[in-house]
């Protein structure tokens, strides 16, 4: 797979089960499930785990869905249960607030991904600076990275670094990129960032490229990799952590994780709680192929049934329109327009929930 000798390379793994995995669970995860998963990850030697609503701090909303518990309740329970693992949170400026970040810190979170669209790093300076003030491990998280050029992403990453980000992430939110795309973007970042600023990669498995793309990122200089046990996450899931760690062991890349414990955890804990099999299927593959935000999958499946338009057709149109995270309302708008054009919808209000 790799033309570069990566033997001895150290990589910090960040598990996404308890945040990105919330999307696959329609935000319906109990505190008991959270604690069980977090404890197993801790015992397997995973250094970082992310815990919030799928949309991050402030995510409980009509648009993003309501979890049965607050972020604070989840965080307090998980932070109180783990011994070695550090707990992180996701924060999207404009959705999550600095007050909520302070609350997360008070609950025990010590790391944060401050996430923006790949062209909007300039919305993050206050949140990154506040995270640094709290003493948190602070990451700038550039989402939908395929929609910006390597050079453009490098400049966005440089901005985040200037605000205080200690790590900058290339985030393949759509699972669209191929290894060459990842290498080009990570290399461009590495060329402009300070040597001490780390680079991370967050992949989705929509085209089955999560592991290959993560290895490509490491080849180009990334030292932090997001993944999820069992691939539990939006779309076809995140890079499956246990498979990624197995590949790393074969290549001599050091993760510090216990492979067999992760394998057992995927089989015994994660797979049984899945509401549906998180895999590459017709719809999730279309997400990757069309470059659509991975969290749109379940929303689109529901809208497809309501309007009688194949989910694949809706996703392709959303990709053509370059819709991004936060524009979930456009799924309904797009499906309604397509239904009208196909003569499936006479009444402009038909199919709209009261």
From Swiss-Prot:
Gene3D superfamilies: 1.10.8.60, Aldolase class I
Record-annotated active site: 23 (proton acceptor)
EC number(s) per entry: 4.1.3.39
UniProt record similarity statement: Belongs to the 4-hydroxy-2-oxovalerate aldolase family.
Domain Pyruvate carboxyltransferase: residue ranges: 11-263
Catalytic activity: (S)-4-hydroxy-2-oxopentanoate = acetaldehyde + pyruvate
Superkingdom of this protein's organism: Bacteria
Name of the protein: 4-hydroxy-2-oxovalerate aldolase 5
HAMAP family per UniProt: HOA
Pfam families: DmpG_comm, HMGL-like
Residues holding substrate: 19-20, 173, 202, 293
Stored InterPro entries: 2-IPM_HCS-like (IPR050073), 4OH_2_O-val_aldolase (IPR017629), Aldolase_TIM (IPR013785), DmpG_comm (IPR012425), DRE_TIM_HOA (IPR035685), PYR_CT (IPR000891)
A GO term for molecular function: manganese ion binding
Annotated site residues (Transition state stabilizer) in this chain: 19
Presence of keyword Metal-binding: yes
Binding site for Mn(2+): 20, 202, 204
Keywords: Aromatic hydrocarbons catabolism, Lyase, Manganese, Metal-binding
Source lineage: Bacteria, Pseudomonadati, Pseudomonadota, Betaproteobacteria, Rhodocyclales
NCBIfam families: 4OH_2_O_val_ald, PRK08195.1
Organism: Dechloromonas aromatica (strain RCB)
Lyase keyword on record: yes
GO biological process annotation, one example: catabolic process
Enzyme class: lyase
């Amino acid at each position: 797979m790799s033309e570069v000798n990566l033997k001895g390379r150290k990589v910090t793994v960040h598990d996404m089960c308890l945040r990105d995995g919330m999307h696959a669970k329609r935000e319906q995860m109990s505190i008991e499930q959270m604690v069980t998963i977090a404890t197993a990850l801790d015992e397997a030697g995973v250094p970082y785990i992310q815990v919030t609503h799928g949309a991050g701090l402030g995510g409980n909303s009509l648009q993003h869905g309501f979890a049965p518990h607050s972020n604070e309740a989840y965080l307090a329970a998980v932070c109180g249960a783990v011994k070695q693992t550090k707990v992180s949170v996701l924060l999207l400026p404009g959705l999550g607030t600095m007050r909520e970040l302070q609350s997360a810190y008070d609950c025990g979170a010590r790391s944060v991904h401050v996430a923006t669209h790949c062209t909007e790093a300039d919305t993050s300076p206050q949140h990154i600076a506040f995270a640094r003030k709290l003493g948190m491990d602070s990451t700038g998280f550039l989402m939908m990275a395929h929609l910006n050029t390597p050079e453009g992403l490098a400049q966005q990453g440089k901005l985040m670094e200037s605000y205080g980000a200690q790590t900058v992430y290339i985030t393949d939110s759509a699972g669209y990129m191929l290894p060459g795309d990842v290498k080009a973007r990570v290399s461009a970042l590495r060329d402009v960032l300070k040597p001490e600023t780390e680079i991370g990669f967050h992949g989705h498995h929509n085209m089955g490229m999560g592991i290959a793309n993560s290895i490509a990122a490491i080849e180009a200089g990334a030292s932090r990799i997001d993944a999820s046990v069992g691939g539990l996450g939006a779309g076809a899931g995140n890079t499956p952590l246990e498979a990624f760690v197995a590949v790393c062991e074969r290549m001599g890349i050091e993760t510090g994780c216990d492979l067999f414990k992760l394998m057992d955890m995927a089989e015994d804990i994660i797979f049984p709680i899945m509401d549906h099999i998180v895999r590459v299927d017709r719809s999730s593959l279309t997400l990757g192929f069309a470059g659509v935000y991975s969290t749109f999958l379940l929303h689109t499946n529901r809208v497809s049934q309501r309007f009688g338009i194949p989910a694949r057709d809706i996703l392709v149109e959303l990709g053509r329109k370059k819709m991004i995270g936060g524009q979930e309302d456009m799924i309904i708008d797009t499906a309604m327009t397509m239904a009208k054009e196909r003569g499936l919808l006479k009444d402009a209000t038909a199919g709209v929930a009261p």
